[in-house]
Amino acid sequence: MKKIRLDTAELEYNIFQSINKEYRTGDNQTENNIVLIHGGIIANANIPLVTFSDILTKNYNILHYHRRGYGKSINKKNDHISILQHVEDCREIMDFLNIKRAHIVGHSIGGTIALQLASIYPDCVKSLILLEPAITGYNEFTNEGVIREFQPIIQMYDKGQRKEAIDIFMKAAIGTNYKELIANILPPNSFELAVVDAKTFFHEEITSMKSWTFTKTQAKDSVHVPVLHIRGIQKTRKISEEREELLRYWLPQTVTRSISNAPHMLQISNTKEVVYLIKLFFQEDNTL
């Protein structure tokens, strides 16, 4: 992966060029760009959206980067990494690569970052695709509940049982067959990388999720682009339904598509369905 140096960070990234030469990045910049913002723990979780097939790379250049504290992306700040800092990082790497406008695909906390990006820098966002977005700061009760779910895993991780803690996380977020899925569709050593990167999520990003706030006024005033929300449906997970209702309240233009029996990291477990829904979203909205 290549690297970009910012004032307080170094971020590694890859550009997957469109197989259609007409849409490739270069001096004649196009708007056929997709930016992938990953969620917590697994930095390469969005990679299957690119490598599964050429459905998206037929007509789009795709930027994939590792956020601060993931992989070899270095955070040089001493304090917690806020959602706003992640937004600025995304904007800077887009500027560096001369990406004026893009479809922003964010998973989990990456969806939170994508939503905030669209609010602060609406001109650089062509559409939002939110995969199981971790929008927690809107409701103190729900927020504390989500954070509380992680506490046993964090305690296990901090006691040195790191692989065991990530094993529990993976089974919940992907499924009991996560090892097979990761081995087949993610880059080598993705589990080992997740064991290391989890420290960033547990001790930096959960804090930033807890303090993040967003309102309908912010959404109404700034976010007018088409929005696709993709969520999994599981009987034991009601929070996805709650977030669907919230997104519709904030952003009435939101189109929600559900995938039955899909876990939180549905871009890994249900790659085919997710890619198809994104493709369909682009096709159905003539403005895209």
What are these regions (language model features)?
Residues Q161-H203:
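Conserved alpha/beta-hydrolase catalytic His-Asp/Glu region
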Residues G106, G110, A114:
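Gly/Ala-rich beta-loop-alpha elbow adjacent to hydrolase catalytic centers
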Residues I104-G106, L131:
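Short beta-strand immediately N-terminal to the catalytic nucleophile in serine-hydrolase-like folds
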Residues F191-Y249, V255-S258:
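Conserved serine/cysteine hydrolase catalytic core
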Residues L115-S119, C124-D158:
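Flexible "cap/lid" loop of the alpha/beta hydrolase fold
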Residues T8-N75, I93:
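Conserved HGGG/HGGXW glycine-rich cap/lid loop of the alpha/beta-hydrolase fold
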Residues I259-T271:
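Catalytic histidine-centered segment of alpha/beta-hydrolase-like enzymes
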Residues L84-A102:
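Conserved acidic catalytic loop of the alpha/beta-hydrolase fold
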